C-alpha cells in the first residue's frame, strides 16, 4: 500500500490562459478536481512541491489528502501536463475518492527478470504488460504490482491467474491474460532439454 501524501492547495476563481500564466509567474500550478458526482473544484498548487512529488515513482497511483481552505479531500492524480522542455508540472487533474473501491492503472515490476531461470538458459524476457488495471480498496491502493519471476523457465508465459495481487485488489477482468513471456532464442535450451543433456553427460 502506498503512503498517503499530504498536500495543500488554494482554491481559485479566475480561469483561462491569462489567469493560468499569472499563476505560473507566481510559482503556482493550476489544477482541477472532479468525479464522484461532485461539482469540479478549481485549485492551484505550489509548483516546486508538486513537481518534486510528480518525479517520484508511481505518482499517478499516489493517494493524496488535499487540504483546500482548511477542508481535506481524498484524491488521486488522473492526468499531468508537463512543460515540453523543462518537464515542470503545468497542470494536474485529480479525481475525488468517495467510493469504497477505485479503478486504478498501476505499473508492474518484474523482480529478478535479468536472472530468471529461462534467461540464464538463453531465453529473452518479453514484457507484454507494463501496467495493469485493478479494482482496489481506496485505503489499500498499491504503488505497483511486484512479481518475482526468478524461477520462470524458458518457453513459458506468466498469466494473470497465477498472480497474487496486493490485499484489497483484483483485476477488472475475469478473462485470463498474459503479462510476460520468456522466449527461446536459437540455441536456447528448455528446462527438459537441459536436464536430458545433463543426464546423458553423467552416463
Swiss-Prot record:
Molecular function (Gene Ontology), one example: 5S rRNA binding
Keyword flag RNA-binding: yes
Gene Ontology CC entries for this record: cytosolic large ribosomal subunit
Signal peptide: none
Alphabetized InterPro entries for the sequence: Rbsml_bL25/Gln-tRNA_synth_N, Ribosomal_bL25/Gln-tRNA_synth, Ribosomal_bL25_b-dom, Ribosomal_bL25_C, Ribosomal_bL25_long, Ribosomal_bL25_short, Ribosomal_L25_dom, Ribosomal_uL5_bac-type
UniProt cross-references to Pfam families, sorted A to Z: Ribosomal_L25p, Ribosomal_TL5_C
Keywords: Ribonucleoprotein, Ribosomal protein, RNA-binding, rRNA-binding
Matching Gene3D superfamilies: Ribosomal protein L25, beta domain (2.170.120.20), Ribosomal Protein L25, Chain P (2.40.240.10)
GO biological process annotation, one example: translation
Subunit comment: Part of the 50S ribosomal subunit; part of the 5S rRNA/L5/L18/L25 subcomplex. Contacts the 5S rRNA. Binds to the 5S rRNA independently of L5 and L18.
Function: This is one of the proteins that binds to the 5S RNA in the ribosome where it forms part of the central protuberance.
HAMAP family named among the record's database cross-references: Ribosomal_bL25, Ribosomal_bL25_CTC
Family stated for the protein in its record: Belongs to the bacterial ribosomal protein bL25 family. CTC subfamily.
Protein's recorded name: Large ribosomal subunit protein bL25
Species, as recorded: Rickettsia felis (strain ATCC VR-1525 / URRWXCal2) (Rickettsia azadi)
This protein's encoding gene: rplY
Amino acid at each position: 500500500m502506498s503512503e498517503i501524501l499530504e498536500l495543500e492547495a488554494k482554491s481559485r476563481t479566475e480561469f483561462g490562459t491569462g489567469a493560468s500564466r499569472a499563476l505560473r509567474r507566481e510559482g503556482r500550478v493550476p489544477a482541477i478536481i472532479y468525479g464522484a458526482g461532485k461539482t469540479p473544484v478549481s485549485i492551484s498548487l505550489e509548483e516546486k512541491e508538486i513537481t518534486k512529488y510528480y518525479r517520484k515513482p508511481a505518482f499517478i497511483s499516489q493517494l493524496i489528502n488535499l487540504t483546500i481552505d482548511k477542508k481535506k479531500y481524498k484524491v488521486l492524480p488522473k492526468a499531468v501536463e508537463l512543460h515540453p522542455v523543462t518537464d515542470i508540472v503545468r497542470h494536474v487533474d485529480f479525481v475525488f475518492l468517495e467510493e469504497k473501491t477505485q479503478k486504478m492503472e498501476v505499473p508492474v515490476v518484474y523482480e529478478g527478470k535479468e536472472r530468471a531461470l529461462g534467461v540464464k538458459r538463453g531465453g529473452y524476457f518479453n514484457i507484454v504488460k507494463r501496467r495493469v488495471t485493478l479494482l482496489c480498496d481506496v485505503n489499500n491502493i498499491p504503488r505497483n504490482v511486484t512479481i518475482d519471476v526468478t524461477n520462470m523457465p524458458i518457453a513459458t508465459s506468466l498469466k494473470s491467474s497465477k498472480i497474487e495481487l496486493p490485499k484489497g485488489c483484483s483485476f477488472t477482468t475475469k478473462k485470463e491474460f498474459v503479462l510476460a513471456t520468456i522466449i527461446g532464442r536459437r540455441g536456447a535450451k528448455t528446462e527438459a532439454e537441459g536436464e536430458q543433456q545433463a543426464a546423458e553427460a553423467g552416463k
